[in-house]
From Swiss-Prot:
Zn(2+) 1 binds at residues 30, 32, 90. Its main location: other. GO terms for biological process: propanediol catabolic process. Pathway: Polyol metabolism; 1,2-propanediol degradation. It holds the Pfam family PTAC. Phosphate binds at residue 84. Its EC number is 2.3.1.222. Formed by 2 beta-barrels, each is capped on both ends by short alpha-helices. Its cofactor is Zn(2+). InterPro entries: PTAC (IPR008300). This is Phosphate propanoyltransferase. It comes from Escherichia fergusonii (strain ATCC 35469 / DSM 13698 / CCUG 18766 / IAM 14443 / JCM 21226 / LMG 7866 / NBRC 102419 / NCTC 12128 / CDC 0568-73). One of its GO terms (cellular component) is bacterial microcompartment. Keywords: Acyltransferase, Bacterial microcompartment, Metal-binding, Transferase, Zinc.
Length: 210
């Protein structure tokens, strides 16, 4: 095949792949616990799988906790596994107001200077001094996905979400690239409500780099 024809064909295929929908995951409030904090809150137990999540080796656990803040509480907040090196609580802005906590917008794992909250299980309770965040909206992807979409780890992109009755463009969507990741955009419940994205079939579409 002529080199120019080959390049044209490859370019067309890549363009079609760039226009494919991105699966959308709506993250409700949830908790990641360290092994030490899990052992304190659920003595003698092991974290147990309730449902596998889209990202490899990630799952919703059977165990839940109550979050207690200065102004209110949130019950039956799901624990996600596996256990981590540090406990982290991810809430929406609405959840944070219910608790009476000013939670900063952060990427997962960026916990320095974040507020804490009281965690209550049926067996014990624990006050963590930091770890509560509102998660920055982001897209997980593999290196191959990043190559196809022409983005790199740490980039910020704009993404369009078309709900049942609305279309909304989100700017400043962080790109997270890892060989262990599958293509999926994560937004919280406040963002999903704003976009009318309550249908599990709703997908996102990459618009451009922010």
């Amino acid at each position: 095949m002529d080199k120019q024809l080959l390049e044209t064909a490859v370019g067309k295929v890549l363009e079609e792949m760039r226009e494919r929908p991105i699966p959308l995951g709506i993250s409700n409030r949830h908790i990641h616990l360290s092994a030490q904090d899990f052992a304190h809150l659920f003595p003698g137990q092991s974290i147990s799988v309730k449902k596998a999540l889209m990202q490899p080796d990630q799952y919703a656990a059977e165990q839940t906790l109550t979050l207690v803040g200065p102004k209110g509480k949130l019950e039956k907040v799901r624990l996600l596994g596996p256990l981590r090196s540090a406990s982290q609580v991810e809430v929406s802005r609405t959840d944070a107001r219910t608790l009476g906590i000013t939670a900063p917008l952060r990427m997962s794992g960026d916990l320095q200077g974040t507020p804490g909250v009281r965690l209550v299980s049926p067996f014990a309770e624990l006050e963590i001094t930091s770890g509560v965040i509102v998660a920055q909206r982001h897209i997980h992807m593999s290196p191959l996905d990043a190559l196809i979409l022409n983005v790199s780890h740490g980039d910020k992109v704009s993404v369009a979400i078309k709900g049942d009755e609305r279309r909304l463009i989100f700017d400043n969507v962080a790109v997270r690239v890892s060989p262990d990741m599958r293509l999926e955009m994560h937004i919280d419940t406040d963002e999903a409500n704003a976009a009318g994205a309550d249908n599990p079939q709703v997908c996102a579409m990459l618009v451009n780099k922010s």
